[in-house]
């Protein structure tokens, strides 16, 4: 990816 913590938030939450 590459755009910020947005994708990470979706994965962790």
UniProtKB/Swiss-Prot annotation:
Main localization of the protein described in the UniProt heading: secreted
Taxonomic classification: Eukaryota, Metazoa, Chordata, Craniata, Vertebrata
Example of a GO cellular component annotation carried by this entry: extracellular region
Post-translational modification Pyrrolidone carboxylic acid, affected residues: 1
GO BP annotations listed: defense response; neuropeptide signaling pathway
Keywords: Amidation, Amphibian defense peptide, Pyrrolidone carboxylic acid, Secreted
Tissue specificity note: Expressed by the skin glands.
Cellular localisation: Secreted
Organism: Pseudophryne guentheri
InterPro entries (UniProt xref): Bombesin
Modified residues (Methionine amide): 13
UniProt record similarity statement: Belongs to the bombesin/neuromedin-B/ranatensin family.
Protein name: Bombesin-like peptide L
């Amino acid at each position: 990816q590459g755009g910020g913590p947005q994708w990470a938030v979706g994965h962790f939450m």
